[in-house]
A protein has these predicted regions:
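DPxDG-like acidic metal-binding loop motif
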Residues: 47-101
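General beta-strand structural signal in soluble alpha/beta enzymes
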Residues: 33-38, 54, 63, 140-143, ...
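Residue-level signal for inorganic ion chemistry
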Residues: 16, 60, 89, 98, ...
């Protein structure tokens, strides 16, 4: 395993490229389209219009530094939107998955959000540092948004707030986990009102999630300038 820089762009590691090539080999054989962080967009040979949005390694810096919190995240998108999702913690083997309309699961256990409504009682995952106190009881910064959002779906965290400006997350970072959140009863939004579902490789989003609409409203209000 090569955790050194790829030399192609900042923040990309050789491991990212190896994982991407391995994933592309499987997805090409399936005939689906692919939107990958590392290699961009490919039209699927099967002609179904289905696209798998994939981040081969989310949390590459964690992987490079030996922090056991990094994942492969995949989301199948069809004409109706996100249809199926899989997020695998590559350090521990823990798997989160969801199918549209059928619920979300972690290694066979059905997921459900915590139900927290009050921001003052919440434990919230963060990306970056908040510009001001957001009112939560405690916060955690783990460094892999795909897994962080799955913790909200599992009820481990009550919410998630991306504090980085300008928007920095590509759709591959969050889309699989957003479907998992929705199937677990967790609500999500984009800070600036943009659609979280996009197949534009250049688009970036600011993602928030919460166990309940009440908590999400409080977090969005606190996060906005």
């Amino acid at each position: 395993r090569d955790f050194g820089p790829s030399g192609l762009r900042d923040g990309q590691y050789a491991l990212d490229l190896v994982a991407d090539e391995a994933a592309l080999g499987v997805l090409r054989r399936a005939g689906v389209g692919v939107l990958s962080e590392e290699s961009g967009f490919e039209v699927g040979a099967a002609g179904t219009g289905e696209v798998v949005v994939i981040d081969p390694i989310d949390g590459s810096t964690n992987a490079a530094r030996g922090v056991p919190w990094f994942a492969t995240a995949q989301c199948l998108v069809d004409a109706h939107g996100p249809a199926a999702a899989l997020v695998v913690n590559q350090a521990s083997g823990v798997r989160y998955w969801a199918v549209r309309g059928e619920g979300a699961w972690c290694d066979g256990v059905r997921l459900q959000g915590s139900g927290c409504r009050e921001v003052g009682e919440s434990i919230v995952g963060l990306n970056g540092l908040p510009p001001r106190p957001l009112g939560y009881r405690q916060s955690r910064v783990f460094g892999a948004v795909a897994l962080d959002l799955c913790l909200v779906a599992a009820g481990v965290l009550d919410g998630y707030v991306d504090c980085v400006d300008p928007p920095a997350h590509g759709v591959w970072d969050y889309l699989a986990s957003v479907l998992i959140c929705h199937e677990a009863g967790v609500v999500t939004t984009e800070l600036h009102g943009d659609d979280l579902v996009t197949l534009d490789h250049t688009s970036r989003r600011t993602v928030l999630a919460a166990a309940t609409p009440e908590l999400l409203e409080s977090l969005v209000a606190a996060r906005r300038p």
